[in-house]
Amino acid sequence: MAKVFFITGIDTDIGKTIATGWYAKKLMQQGASVITQKMIQTGCRGIAEDLLTHRKIQGIELTEEDKQGITCPYVFDYPCSPHLAAKLEQRTIERKKIETCTALLCEKYDYVLLEGAGGLCVPYNEEETTLDYLCQHQYPVILVTSGKLGSINHTLLSLQVLNSKRVSVHAVIYNLYPETDQVISQETQHFLRRYLEKYSPNTLFEVMDLISV
C-alpha cells in the first residue's frame, strides 16, 4: 500500500504545485514509483493544469490515470474557491469520489502526493474544509512556505492548527521563489529552521531549488 503525503501551503500561490512536482521527482530519483494527485482544480478545463506542471517537473508524460481523471476527479472552469466553483456549475464535490481515486492510485504506486487547493481552511463544499479532510484521513502533511514578508506568521499558524488537530507534519518545504528581500528571506529561513528543531524535531526542513517551468 502506498504512502500518501498531503501537500498544502501557508497561502494561495505559495508554490504548492511546483513543490509537489519537485518532491515527486526527488522520490523518483530514490527509486520509488510516484504519482501526484490534485484534490480539486479550479480555473481550467480538461486535464488539470497543475498535473501538467507536475509531469513537466517530473520529466514524464501524462499517465493513463491523468487521462482517465483519476489524478484529478474534479476540474472547474472558474478560478475561485472549490466550493464556489462547484456551486457556479451546479455540481457537488463529494469526499468519497476523491477517496476512491486516491485508493486506486495507492494500489499501483509507492507514493501518492495529494495536492490540496489553496490553504488549510479552504472549503471544498458547503460543509467541509481541506482541514476537515485531513483530520478524517490523518495523512502526513508537507507544508509549503516561502521567504516573503508574513510567511513566519502564516507558517506558525498553520503548524499550530495542524498540531492542535493531531495531524503530523512530515516536512516543511521552503520555496526560494519569489526572490524578494534577501534580508527578510534569509531570516525567515533561519527562524523556521530553528523553530522546527525546537518544537517539531521530527519534521524535515527542505529548501526547494529555484525551478523554471
Swiss-Prot record:
Pathway: Cofactor biosynthesis; biotin biosynthesis; biotin from 7,8-diaminononanoate: step 1/2. Substrate binds at residue 42. GO terms for biological process: biotin biosynthetic process. It catalyses: (7R,8S)-7,8-diammoniononanoate + CO2 + ATP = (4R,5S)-dethiobiotin + ADP + phosphate + 3 H(+). It is found in: Cytoplasm. The active site is at residue 38. Keywords: ATP-binding, Biotin biosynthesis, Cytoplasm, Ligase, Magnesium, Metal-binding, Nucleotide-binding. Its cofactor is Mg(2+). The keyword Membrane does not apply. Disulfide bonds: none annotated. GO terms for cellular component: cytosol. Its EC number is 6.3.3.3. Mg(2+) binds at residues 17, 50, 115. InterPro entries: DTB_synth_BioD, P-loop_NTPase. It is an enzyme of class 6 (ligase). GO terms for molecular function: ATP binding; dethiobiotin synthase activity; magnesium ion binding. ATP binds at residues 13-18, 50, 115-118. Belongs to the dethiobiotin synthetase family. Catalyzes a mechanistically unusual reaction, the ATP-dependent insertion of CO2 between the N7 and N8 nitrogen atoms of 7,8-diaminopelargonic acid (DAPA, also called 7,8-diammoniononanoate) to form a ureido ring. Homodimer. This is ATP-dependent dethiobiotin synthetase BioD 2. It comes from Pasteurella multocida (strain Pm70). The gene is bioD2.
